[in-house]
């Protein structure tokens, strides 16, 4: 028999052989068994049942091939909550929590807002959970991502209006007016794929990562349609790549020269947010 500590030591050895940090093996064990670190300490010398060994070994093999842990275990954390994820939607990043907070702080309690390109729904659902009186709309072009977002909304008992379609087009068709817009759209230039981690490019959905026109195509589509949906004085907040702030600011000002555009850095000192009032 093997205990949990011995199995983890074996996993750490294999993980390091593949060039990954040992913390990946540690997090995998905690997430596969949905344990805290305290749970592991309590059970580390317990013999592992055969079913648990098989379950962990299968997960470990997937991780050693580079698959993200969140896809293996089927969930990810965002702003203290757990959301179901799969390979049809991006894994939420910690930096996106900063984007969400910047937007949240600008909203009236009963505002009507939209999350464009909702993916797994983490932004829309978190905003609704934090301010329950918000009227939250979420859009995505991917039916598979929208199904995941709906499941997450049900899990968190969040009433969200989901509209499938391209950027703001579904809202224009419905005649909806907004008191706020947030979007973390696809914004990576295809040519940058060669510099990215294979864990991202092999497993996360390309449609949610990459955009035409050097990564700006979705931003441009949203910006073009803002006059049709935004109420005066309402916040517009975009998550951006680390080197996109000035270029996106120029795109906005070329279209709407009277706007005051803020470029805000994340906790790591990288440009992360473009924000302005409509």
UniProtKB/Swiss-Prot annotation:
InterPro entries, per the entry: DNA_methylase_N6_adenine_CS, HemK-like, N5-glutamine_MTase, PrmC_N, RF_methyltr_PrmC, SAM-dependent_MTases_sf, Small_mtfrase_dom
Binding of substrate, residues: 184-187
GO biological process: methylation; translational termination
GO molecular function: nucleic acid binding; protein-(glutamine-N5) methyltransferase activity; protein-glutamine N-methyltransferase activity
Domain of life of the organism encoding this protein: Bacteria
Pfam family, one: MTS
EC number(s) on file: 2.1.1.297
Catalytic reaction annotation: L-glutaminyl-[peptide chain release factor] + S-adenosyl-L-methionine = N(5)-methyl-L-glutaminyl-[peptide chain release factor] + S-adenosyl-L-homocysteine + H(+)
Signal peptide range: none
Keywords annotated in UniProt: Methyltransferase, S-adenosyl-L-methionine, Transferase
Annotated binding of S-adenosyl-L-methionine, by residue: 117-121, 140, 184
Keyword Ion transport: no
HAMAP family, alphabetized: RF_methyltr_PrmC
PANTHER family: HEMK METHYLTRANSFERASE, MTRF1L RELEASE FACTOR GLUTAMINE METHYLTRANSFERASE
Annotated family: Belongs to the protein N5-glutamine methyltransferase family. PrmC subfamily.
Main function: Methylates the class 1 translation termination release factors RF1/PrfA and RF2/PrfB on the glutamine residue of the universally conserved GGQ motif.
UniProt-listed NCBIfam families: hemK_fam, RF_mod_PrmC
Protein name: Release factor glutamine methyltransferase
Gene name linked to the record: prmC
